[in-house]
């Protein structure tokens, strides 16, 4: 199983119907030490496996965007969690870490450029943490940065709004579950800064693959991102 598992919350903490045992109790019974925040992790002496959840998120599925937090309610940042994971796993035995900046995708689904930039910035902090580790262990470390897809079809230096046929927009009704007000706000901010979007969903646009370290040459050129697994395992 996993030795170190951290995230912004647990989906269906008590099952889909809400009638099951708390999942943290189940995890602890299976041998994991559940820590609410990196502060609790620092006092943990469990070497068989830990699960780290933000201190304020015991029964929440996800954090708000970092930029929306109050100054006195900041949660552990992605880079800090990655640094804790590296320290927990140590450098005596080989390890593999998958670290995801998932809020980048969420913000792009909303065409929310402000929060997407903030999420990318925090992901970049995590990449810097990984790169610092690579500098200390250059002959035995491989770092890969990529994405499973692009979202939103973002274009910089586009969309000044002149193509919108405002006179042709007809009055209509909104679905009860669609927050069009928020989406329109996000689009307005993007338009004001000459940023264009093509969709609120995933696109088929190519995504970059960056690699540094041992075996990085295997990731040069164009490859299908589903081939990454095989290249890593072969390494």
Question: Residue spans of the language-model regions?
Answer:
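A post-motif C-terminal structural segment
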Residues: 1-235
